[in-house]
Design a protein with these regions (language model features):
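A short helix-to-beta-strand connector/capping loop
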Residues: 57-67, 190
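Long, compositionally biased stretches enriched for glycine and/or charged residues
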Residues: 186-372
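N-terminal Rossmann-like dinucleotide-binding module
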Residues: 5-30, 36
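NAD(P)-binding Rossmann-fold cofactor-contacting core
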Residues: 29-56
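Redox-cofactor binding/interface segments in oxidoreductases and associated redox assembly factors
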Residues: 77, 83-84, 147
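Internal, well-ordered domain-core segments that constitute the primary functional module
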Residues: 132-216
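Rossmann-fold NAD(P)-binding glycine/threonine-rich loop
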Residues: 88, 92-162
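Short acidic low-complexity segments
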Residues: 65-78
Length: 373
């Protein structure tokens, strides 16, 4: 019987095509048979994504069943996996999460996952996420929910506490932190083996070793950090270096992420998210309009051309047919096909993995995926 995979929020131009590619490029899943259901609440969002899925399947020469629907129950009925990436009017509410706390003196780095803004972001996304999980309890109680939505660990914890559905959350922040370490050490990331744990968007590298020699790279990292100019690439490394010198471990993924969980971080992080509006024309929470914003993970966040080029029409066919590097497909390969995978970072209930955190708390830790889960 084919493996039914429901992509919830498939109309997203980042999540939908990349996850579709990963599924179609998975030889174990394709050989097992795939029934891929693209689900989004907005029908027009599905048009391009469904077209892309059929294009990619034909281009790759794989035979899978593809359908698109706006009906959540139809998508989940009999599913083996639900892969979810949703948000509620993201940028309008993010601008509110960012500015309203600042109005009352809460200086946030991002306002996405931590602090007052992160709390309201979580409360907005919890209701639809738990609704998805409760629908799964009725229609596919043995299925796994693979979540990409933020705030990652808060949503996964809501599902694990309030429903019986097995849930795992995924984030690529681990690789951002690994890239920082590789840059400082001058060693390619593929030659580094590192273990990190903590909560989503705030983990600590417990071990950093050279894959070939097995050498502990922390002594070299400390040496290279001390040698570096204190203000070099401050936006990217400043807060990390402060924490590293104080606690002896390198934090991950980046200051603009874990800075959300540190009250004083705003004093040491050059904000890489800025919403711009003229208050004389009304605040975004009054007008309902999304203000202009700049958002950057690296470099100068406010550097924009004087006369921006008009946006080009989105063509999903232009995306190369190669894996995204996310772990949803490997997890599905493990559970549905018994392929053993080593996963450097997943968000799951703690259950003793980190002894000084409660068992029911969702933590980000490395894991092994196999037929047992």
């Amino acid at each position: 019987m084919p493996v039914k995979i429901a992509l919830i929020g498939a109309g997203s131009r980042s999540f939908g095509p990349s996850t579709i590619r990963d599924v179609l490029l998975s030889k174990p899943l394709v050989e097992a048979g795939v029934h891929l259901v693209l689900m989004d609440k907005v029908a027009e969002h599905l048009v391009d994504v469904e077209r892309y899925a059929r294009y990619a399947a034909e281009k790759l020469g794989v035979k899978v069943t593809i359908e698109a629907t706006t009906d959540l129950q139809r998508a989940l009925d009999g599913a083996r996996f639900a892969v979810c990436a949703i948000d509620v009017n993201r940028f309008l509410y993010w601008s509110q999460d960012f500015h309203i706390p600042r109005k009352y003196g809460f200086r946030q780095v991002f306002g996405e996952n931590g602090g007052p803004g992160g709390l309201f972001h979580a409360l907005r996304n919890m209701a639809p996420t738990v609704e998805i999980a409760r629908t799964m309890e009725r229609l596919c109680p043995d299925a796994w929910l693979i979540n990409f939505s933020n705030p990652e660990h808060k949503l996964c914890e809501a599902v694990s506490r309030l429903t019986s559905i097995r849930v795992v959350g995924l984030c690529h922040g681990y690789f951002m932190g690994l890239a920082q370490i590789a840059h400082i050490l001058g060693i390619p990331t593929e030659e580094i083996e590192a273990t990190a744990c903590g909560i989503n968007h705030f983990t600590w590298f417990q071990t950093i070793r050279h894959k070939r020699t097995g050498d502990d790279l922390y002594p070299l990292l400390r040496e290279r950090e001390r040698e570096g100019d204190w203000l070099a690439e401050w936006h990217e490394y400043g807060l990390a270096r402060i924490l590293f010198r104080r606690f002896g471990l390198w934090p991950s993924p980046a200051p603009n992420h874990y800075g959300e969980y540190i009250r004083w971080a705003d004093e040491f992080v050059c904000s890489e998210l800025q919403f711009f509006y003229d208050p004389a024309d009304g605040h975004p929470w009054q007008t309902g309009r999304i203000p202009e914003f700049v958002y950057s993970l690296t470099g100068d966040p406010t550097r924009r051309p004087w006369k921006p080029e008009p946006p080009q029409p989105w063509r999903p066919e232009d995306a190369p047919l190669k894996p995204s590097g996310e772990f949803a497909a490997p997890i599905m390969e493990s559970i549905a096909c018994g392929v053993r995978h080593s996963l450097p970072a997943v968000n799951v209930p703690n259950r003793g993995a980190i002894p000084n955190l409660p068992d029911e708390t969702v933590v980000e830790v490395p894991a092994i995926g196999d037929a047992e889960g």
